[in-house]
From Swiss-Prot:
The modification Phosphoserine is found at residues 3, 35, 49, 102, 124, 138. The modification N6-succinyllysine is found at residues 7, 11, 16, 40. This is Hemoglobin subunit alpha. One of its GO terms (molecular function) is oxygen carrier activity. It comes from Rangifer tarandus (Reindeer). Residues 1-141 form the Globin domain. InterPro entries: Globin, Globin-like_sf, Globin/Proto, Hemoglobin_a-typ, Hemoglobin_oxygen_transport, Hemoglobin_pi. Red blood cells. O2 binds at residue 58. Involved in oxygen transport from the lung to the various peripheral tissues.
Length: 141
């Protein structure tokens, strides 16, 4: 459960991301594909090279979903229900991959916002991404 301080930290950090969210989403995906090559198996139809239009487009989808989630921190299950259905029933993404993407998102944010990425903000973003991952995997059961 996110505390009031966590919610404030997440909103403030995501506010600093601003219009860079799609680019950061794409960068986090690239980092994930490079660091955890098995994740590429879910994207056999994608050009996974650096700067790929498909990776950029999917990064934007990820960023838009996170932006939506940040705006509805008190109702993540309702906000992300459609995405949970998609990933569980149609795409059948192994739940561990959400943790891997969360990790690369944190690394990406830390690299772009070093002065804002305090231990408290890191912890709050980590909790937020863990909550998002939990919601996205909730319909696997």
């Amino acid at each position: 459960v996110l505390s009031a301080a966590d919610k404030s930290n997440v909103k403030a950090a995501w506010g600093k991301v601003g219009g860079n969210a799609p680019a950061y989403g794409a960068e986090a995906l690239e980092r994930m594909f490079l660091s955890f090559p098995t994740t590429k198996t879910y994207f056999p139809h994608f050009d996974l090279s650096h700067g790929s239009a498909q990776v950029k487009a999917h990064g934007e989808k990820v960023a838009n979903a996170l932006t939506k989630a940040v705006g509805h921190l008190d109702d993540l299950p309702g906000t992300l229900s459609d995405l949970s259905d998609l990933h569980a029933h149609k795409l059948r993404v192994d739940p561990v991959n959400f943790k891997l993407l969360s990790h690369t998102l944190l690394v990406t944010l830390a690299s772009h916002l070093p002065s804002d990425f305090t231990p408290a903000v890191h912890a709050s973003l980590d909790k937020f991404l863990a909550n998002v991952s939990t919601v996205l995997t909730s319909k696997y059961r």
